[in-house]
């Protein structure tokens, strides 16, 4: 009889333990769902930048080759140099008789991020008539990637290709794939930035200046070697989906930006490379921080870009 009572108590204790474990797991799952919900739906409402990127990305997923009225479409693709250097509403108005213009700007990106995002857009059905990639030479040949943030804008196939291409380690690879599938994981850094900006409102300007440093000087031969491979793969991608590729090189303060090297390569490869403003010819007063144009500089560059496109 005591043995039966003992077994009964043990069974009750085991049941209570199982229920406790289940409650903990349910709590963890609910917490995870709440965090995902915050990341997926709240961040783009809290952050003006996140909201803009989400809106532009969604709009870029469904670009037709032509509008219902037969007008060709164009997508401008780039980073903060494009964002601040081209007055988009004015540019769109200037181009309205020729193109229906879209834009996708993701700050702190360089060639690799934008190339794989473009691949994803094409694969998901976007068919712009013209693709205009606006990147400085240093960003065209640069190897920096934004990683976790941009992973959510790339297909898993493209992300795997990027991992192999850059020989990323196992930890980084795991983080990127978590970021691809998890809204919270992909935006956790941005959430921290947003919170920091709320506490220290002036930190945005400081981080822009500190985080946007000139790339190490490259020789003409290095620029040519790297640019040629990248221009070729861009052209192959755009040709596959029937889009015309244009590279736009934005203005710089330095006269030695090797823009003419890229332009010459474009002519050799049959790619339109535009330099609306020659390097080193815009006054320093038209730049906000030595890299990005201010509103006056953007007004000048926007008009020049529209005239050559």
Regions found by a protein language model. Name each.
Residues 50-68:
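Short extracytoplasmic/periplasmic juxtamembrane "stem" segments immediately C-terminal to an N-terminal membrane anchor
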Residues 70, 77, 81-165:
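Membrane-embedded segments
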Residues 108-112, 223-225, 250-258:
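Acidic-and-aromatic substrate-binding clefts and catalytic sites of carbohydrate-active enzymes
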Residues 19-40:
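Hydrophobic membrane-insertion alpha-helices, especially the h-region
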Residues 1-18:
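N-terminal Lys/Arg-rich, disordered targeting/topogenic segments
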Residues 105, 249, 275-277:
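Residue-level recognition of beta-strand->loop/alpha-helix junctions
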């Amino acid at each position: 009889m005591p043995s039966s009572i003992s077994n009964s108590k043990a069974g009750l204790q085991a049941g209570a333990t199982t229920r406790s474990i289940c409650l903990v797991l349910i709590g963890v799952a609910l917490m995870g769902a709440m965090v995902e919900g915050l990341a997926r739906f709240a961040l783009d409402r809290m952050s003006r930048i996140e909201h803009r990127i989400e809106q532009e990305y969604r709009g870029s997923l469904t670009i037709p080759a032509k509008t219902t009225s037969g007008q060709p479409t164009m997508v401008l693709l780039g980073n903060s140099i494009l964002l601040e250097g081209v007055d988009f509403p004015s540019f769109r108005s200037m181009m309205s008789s020729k193109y229906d213009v879209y834009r996708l700007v993701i700050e702190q990106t360089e060639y690799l991020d934008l190339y794989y995002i473009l691949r994803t857009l094409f694969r998901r059905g976007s068919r712009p008539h013209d693709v205009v990639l606006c990147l400085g030479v240093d960003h065209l040949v640069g190897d920096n990637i934004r990683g976790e943030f941009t992973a959510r804008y790339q297909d898993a196939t493209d992300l795997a290709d990027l991992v192999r291409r850059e020989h990323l380690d196992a930890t980084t690879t795991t983080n990127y794939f978590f970021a691809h599938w998890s809204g919270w994981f992909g935006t956790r850094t941005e959430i921290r930035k947003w919170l920091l900006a709320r506490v220290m409102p002036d930190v945005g300007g400081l981080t822009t200046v500190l985080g946007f440093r000139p790339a190490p000087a490259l020789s003409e031969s290095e620029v040519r070697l790297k640019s040629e491979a990248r221009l070729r793969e861009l052209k192959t991608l755009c040709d596959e989906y029937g889009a015309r590729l244009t590279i736009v090189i934005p203005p710089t303060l330095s006269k030695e930006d090797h823009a003419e090297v890229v332009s010459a390569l474009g002519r050799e490869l049959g790619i339109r490379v535009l330099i609306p403003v020659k390097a080193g010819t815009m006054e320093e007063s038209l730049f906000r921080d030595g890299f990005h144009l201010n509103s006056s500089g953007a007004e000048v560059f926007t008009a020049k870009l529209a005239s050559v496109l």
